[in-house]
Structures are given as C-alpha cells and as structure tokens.
C-alpha cells in the first residue's frame, strides 16, 4: 500500500508518516518544495531504519512535490491547516484519480483566521471533510479521520492511547482506513458513520486542545462501552 501524505513535513503529517513507515508501509512525503520533501524523507528513513541498523530504502520512504506524491499513491492523506485546505485540494486535484482514497484530517480551528485554537469555525458545507469532498474529483472516496490524534504522541516511542473515529459515505474505503489506523500501536479505530458526522469529530479537537493548554498534556479520545468488534481490533 502506498500512502502520500500531503503536508507531510508538518508535525501531524510527519508523525503519521513515521508510524506507518515503522509498520512497513510505503510512504511518500509531500511538500510544496520537493527539496524539503526529500530532506524530510531522509530524516524519516534515519529514524525508522537507523536505530535498527537497517539500510535506508528510498523506495519505501520518499519525498516529492505534493502533486507528484499523489499520482502514484493508493491513499492520499491531507494534513494541512484549514486555511490551506481548499487551495491545496485545488492544486492536487489533477493528480487525483478514481479508485483513490483521500483522507482528510483537517480541523477548522478559529486559529486559522487569527482566533483561538480552542474554537471551531463554521464551514458552509457542514465540516472541513465535506468541503474536501466538494473539491475532490468524482470517483475518489473521501474519508475523515485522525482529527483527535496528538501530533506530539505520534513522535514519541510507544503506543498511542487514543481511538480514531472514521467517517465516510464509502464503507469499503472507511474500512481500509480503519485498518490503516490500527497499524499505529495503541490506536483503536471506530466507525463514525457517514461523512457528515465529521463535523462533530472535528469539534472535539478544539476541546482536546483546551485540555492540553490547561493541563500541559497530550490528551486523546477513548470510546468506551462498545462490544469488542466495534473497535476493529
């Protein structure tokens, strides 16, 4: 499975890239600047393979300009701030094609327009994920996920104590992304229903940021009380 991470040089994108590369997935770091993407990929290879004494393999972890990164990927993960989401989707749209899955991790925080990171903006389409779906070519499945994962926890060794809520109108695509989420140690994946439910999941992120600011922590979300099969473990 090849995964292009758009915004892969940022904290969230690089953290997801690190975890999936450790799980043996082929990861392509996307950036506006190909050189920056290549440098980020080199650092990631050193983290993943250096400590274990395994030679770096460019074919497993590589870097490319965002549009180029999308062209050969089965799954495209968008990890850019809300203010950059629409522009980025318009940029990569020509490189997206039917059969791909676009995973949107965007949270419409008020900080994107100079407001507080503990508040969300209203999105005309209902959610950032629904806005992404509107800007995505026909035949590309849009899945909303990974909104509530702390970027800091992704970069720390050890399991991530957090559940990932996955929302999509395409059940098969959602199932694939839940399986991908489970490759991160400690993470459970929960079916969040249709894409419109992403609005609720996105709002939770602002609440978690508030917890983190007040407590100087890295809070996550756990869904309890469901039967074991609901967590896709």
Residue positions per predicted region:
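Rossmann-like NAD(P)-binding element
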Residues: 55-101, 108-115
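Glycine-rich beta-alpha junction loops
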Residues: 84, 106-109, 149-150, 170, ...
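NAD(P)+-binding Rossmann beta1-loop-alpha1 motif at the extreme N-terminus of oxidoreductases
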Residues: 1-46, 183
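A short helix-to-beta-strand connector/capping loop
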Residues: 47-62, 138-141, 187
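Short beta-strand and adjoining strand-loop segment in the mid-core
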Residues: 115-125, 156-172
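Active-site-lining helix/loop region of Rossmann-like oxidoreductase modules
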Residues: 162-233
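General beta-strand structural signal in soluble alpha/beta enzymes
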Residues: 63, 103-104, 141-145, 189-192
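Rossmann-fold dehydrogenase core element
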Residues: 122-146
